[in-house]
């Protein structure tokens, strides 16, 4: 089996039918021509924010990571492992892609430990067992995995989806693409930066050009590139016609080098 490709979905993609249609059309086109197995990892930040608003619950973040109190983890699990995951499975079904919905704890695919007491039920992802996912891939299924995990003591944890995808890529020896709303990392003039190193990233953070959630994303991508020992791509789902090329190794966004 060829080494798998993990596509991490983020941003407003889950909220946009147009975006999902573009993405799944690109997946179908890619699968027609390539044998490479695909795995989708997703969060669902926007979906969770909307749900919190409806329930009048405050959304607190610390260093770009969502604070998840004990009384909110069930709601967030429902949104991510439930609604977001099943929405993606429904789109896969509509496009004739055989898929299976999972969370990080299934088959111990990604192991999770608590990240920081102040963040509550927020987990740090670590490589786990490739057995279940490889079994699914060998049988032609596309796993669709939410970024909810579980600790060894049985506590549900909300995990940053970029970090979850990185841990899974390390588990499977897979390549990784982080798909989001932005076409990559932009410089001070709004131009796409084609390649990014650790030194360049720190410089742009110090200059205030990379801020907030993008800092978390860049650090996750740099960690991923270091952990995996190979480049990681950050790109946008908006350029649907370029996605099959991206899935085939052509950089259309920012390529993060270890």
Swiss-Prot record:
It is found in: Cytoplasm. InterPro entries: AceGlu_kinase-like_sf, AcgluKinase_fam, ArgB, Asp/Glu/Uridylate_kinase, NAGK-NC. The keyword Cytoplasm applies. Keywords: Amino-acid biosynthesis, Arginine biosynthesis, ATP-binding, Cytoplasm, Kinase, Nucleotide-binding, Transferase. It catalyses: N-acetyl-L-glutamate + ATP = N-acetyl-L-glutamyl 5-phosphate + ADP. One of its GO terms (biological process) is L-arginine biosynthetic process. Substrate binds at residues 44-45, 66, 158. ATP binds at residues 181-186, 209-211. The record marks 8, 217 as: Transition state stabilizer. Signal peptide: none annotated. Pfam families: AA_kinase. Its EC number is 2.7.2.8. GO terms for molecular function: acetylglutamate kinase activity; ATP binding. CDD domains: AAK_NAGK-NC. Pathway: Amino-acid biosynthesis; L-arginine biosynthesis; N(2)-acetyl-L-ornithine from L-glutamate: step 2/4. GO terms for cellular component: cytoplasm. Its main location: cytoplasm. Belongs to the acetylglutamate kinase family. ArgB subfamily. Homodimer. Catalyzes the ATP-dependent phosphorylation of N-acetyl-L-glutamate. HAMAP family: ArgB. This is Acetylglutamate kinase.
């Amino acid at each position: 089996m060829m080494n798998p490709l993990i596509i991490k979905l983020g941003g407003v993609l889950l909220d946009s039918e147009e975006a999902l249609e573009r993405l799944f059309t690109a997946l179908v086109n890619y699968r027609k021509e390539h044998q490479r197995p695909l795995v989708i990892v997703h969060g669902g930040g926007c979906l969770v924010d909307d749900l919190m608003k409806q329930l009048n619950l405050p959304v607190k973040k610390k260093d770009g990571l969502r604070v998840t109190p004990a009384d909110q983890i069930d709601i967030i699990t429902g949104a991510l492992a439930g609604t977001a995951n099943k929405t993606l499975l429904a789109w896969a079904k509509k496009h004739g892609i055989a898929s299976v919905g999972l969370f990080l704890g299934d088959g111990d695919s990604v192991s999770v430990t608590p990240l920081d007491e102040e963040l509550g039920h927020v987990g740090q992802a670590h490589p786990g067992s490739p057995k279940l996912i490889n079994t699914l891939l060998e049988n032609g299924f596309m796993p669709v995995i939410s970024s909810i995990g579980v600790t060894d003591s049985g506590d549900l944890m909300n995990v940053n989806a970029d970090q979850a995808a990185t841990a899974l890529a390390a588990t499977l020896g897979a390549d990784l693409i982080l798909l989001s709303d932005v076409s990559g990392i932009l410089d001070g003039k709004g131009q796409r930066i084609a390649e990014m190193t650790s030194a360049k990233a720190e410089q742009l953070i110090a200059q205030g050009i990379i801020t907030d959630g993008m800092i978390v994303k860049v650090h996750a991508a740099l960690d991923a590139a270091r952990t995996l020992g190979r480049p990681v791509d950050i790109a946008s789902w908006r350029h649907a016609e370029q996605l099959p090329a991206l899935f085939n190794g052509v950089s259309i966004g920012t390529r993060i080098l270890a």
